[in-house]
Amino acid sequence: TGVQTCALPILGIDKRQYQQYTYVSHDHKESIDNSRRGGASHKFSKDNRVSIEAYANYHKVFREDHTLDAVAGYSFWQAGGEDFNMANYDFPVDGVGPWDMGVGSYLSEGRATMDSGKDPRERLLSLFGRANYSYRDRYMVSASFRREGSSKFGANNRWGNFWALSGGWRISNETFLRDVRWVNDLKVRLGYGVTGNNGFGNGYTTRMYKANDMWPTNGIWQPGYGSVRNVNPDLKWEEKSELNFGLDFSLFDDRLWGKFDIYHRKVDDMLYEVNAPMPPMVHDTVMKNIGSLENKGWEFELGGDIVRSKNFRYTSSLRLSHNKSKIKRLGDDGYFLDQVTFPSPGNPGTAVRLQNDVEIGQFFVYKYAGLDEDGKWMIYDKNNEIVPAVDGTKSNLVAENKHFVGNAIPKVILSWDHTFRYKNWDLSVFLRSWLDYD
């Protein structure tokens, strides 16, 4: 029946500074190899991060059986940095070290180096709220909403709305299980939610410039300036929606426990750096929202105290998981991305191709068909017919003759952990296994 409220502001400031001073003497091997009388360098960088968060909590129990918890708040995060580097060579004496940078002859000769830069400022602002309701700790409902704005996106797409709904039923608190003493906890849950992703570098929506090649201008070499990367003002939030069903249990005086989850995820407006035509673009890649990805799987965990005594405990837990991902849409029809280049020798090209309706993890390679009577390699072509890899001057090792084969992603990932505790001592053993993959 009581009501509890709490409001709390939080301010965080993180400032980091890095400085490095280096001097290489006249007699150092680097100076001798480059015919220089010493060398000095200064390196400086700093990183500034500010975070502000304010939120209010609300808690109320009414009619003894009903509990409501709620929180609402605001958060702000900002990051930025800068750096400066300089180097000079050929100093008259060693004794001054790196503290008289101007006397090195490389500066007067125009051969000293100096550069500086400033990171684009990044900001993230969030308004959020969450409410949890339970009846006798038996039936539970939760709802949350978050509105986030990120400076990484274009002016018209900076804000995204993300939400989640979930419900749970603690069956172990029902009257029909009250006398079943070996069941300590049994709960089923169902949830659906949408989250956003802005996990890529800054500066993809605003034109940035830097000095590059030197060009002669009126008899003087001057640096030319060019854009750092292609910009895309239409970038927007990548969104992941997930439907999840789960079961939690604890049995036999909490000596045996476990959980099972099955999920279906979909990612829309995937953020990816893709190839770009030159011209009209200046660089050969551009960040885009290019498609959607489907992800399905399950996870299972079973653990327990095998031995439990006053001074000694042996705990073991087993975890299994399965996951399958498929590209549902990737850019325009017929678009694909070739990745993971084979090492030399032979220059066999790439091993992976991402395209519509293809399961992630498959290899995209030439399919070996054996050797002919002369010992030459044979492959399956695009029509699945056996042809020589190289027929005289004609090579059949072309992309259209590649096939999707195998899969590098394991069908099941298994882990088995063991922990032994004796008084204040403990020993842990972790075993991992990847099953059924190519």
Give the ranges of each region predicted by the language model.
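Oxyanion-binding "anion nests"
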Residues: F420-R421
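Surface-exposed, extracytoplasmic segments of Gram-negative outer-membrane nutrient-acquisition systems
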Residues: N218-V228, K266-I290, S325-I409, D417, ...
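Extracellular/periplasmic, surface-exposed regions of secreted and cell-surface proteins
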Residues: T1, T5-V24, S35-A351
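Structural motif
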Residues: R255, N424-D426
